């Protein structure tokens, strides 16, 4: 069995740490919240993010970055996108050998429009890069941690890394498929969060299934258009990392992005909705990144543009809806 250091103690990092431990691997989690660290070590739980879930007793946690760095040659990066570059640079400064980096972040860097694997590669010295991959797909942490059937995709430019991810995580309740389209899998995971926020708004406003179905379908079209422009295989968006992740995130109250949108749809201001979130809603930040990226690439993304107006320009919801529905006639 292997050793894996998990950087990040949020809901998904915790759920995947539990999967790894149940698969027989040694797991050390790293985080900054002393209460969460003590709770994992003493009570085998992380109630701040997964209330009521009992974790494998073999999992340990630390706030000592060097301890986590030296624990293994395989790292699971389960941090918000905006925190990744700084943490990876700190890790890199302490390394003296190659490590494998597996990430589960679903975002795009605001300043550079880079995917998370590109951020990690940028922040690593070449001599420390033993391979970078992603694990992504329709996988709410709340369901994974109680062993409900889940399927996800593992992707890396290096087939050996994809296979490593599959071998580490796959078991009788978590099925892992390999996928060689890293660009598509990462973009699918990041871009669907935009549509999830919009889907939550639609639900919060009280609209029915017709509107929700239209939003997801046309949202997938937007994701595919930008994805192809950035080098993704369009077929990837019909798989787990695309429509699979889109469906689960746009239809569930487990989704923090859907929840953020729902609060806004019910009449809360954006600031009020954000202040009530216990965890990071990546879709908020990704909307801004992708809006500007689409403008730069001249890609038509009307849902993203409308959501950007709501989130960052205080465009009223009813006005935004009228703009979307009143666009010029087009073929599908």
Swiss-Prot record:
GO terms for cellular component: cytosol. The keyword Cell membrane does not apply. InterPro entries: 6-PGluconate_DH-like_C_sf, 6PGD_dom2, G3P_DH_NAD-dep, G3P_DH_NAD-dep_C, G3P_DH_NAD-dep_N, NAD(P)-bd_dom_sf. Sn-glycerol 3-phosphate binds at residues 106, 137, 139, 192, 245, 255-257. It comes from the Bacteria. NADPH binds at residues 11-12, 32, 106, 141, 256, 280, 282. Pfam families: NAD_Gly3P_dh_C (PF07479), NAD_Gly3P_dh_N (PF01210). Pathway: Membrane lipid metabolism; glycerophospholipid metabolism. The active site is at residue 192. GO terms for biological process: carbohydrate metabolic process; glycerol-3-phosphate biosynthetic process; glycerol-3-phosphate catabolic process; glycerophospholipid metabolic process; phospholipid biosynthetic process. Its EC number is 1.1.1.94. Signal peptide: none annotated. Keywords: Cytoplasm, Lipid biosynthesis, Lipid metabolism, NAD, NADP, Nucleotide-binding, Oxidoreductase, Phospholipid biosynthesis, Phospholipid metabolism. Catalyzes the reduction of the glycolytic intermediate dihydroxyacetone phosphate (DHAP) to sn-glycerol 3-phosphate (G3P), the key precursor for phospholipid synthesis. Belongs to the NAD-dependent glycerol-3-phosphate dehydrogenase family. This is Glycerol-3-phosphate dehydrogenase [NAD(P)+]. The lineage of its organism: Bacteria, Bacillati, Bacillota, Bacilli, Bacillales. The gene is gpsA.
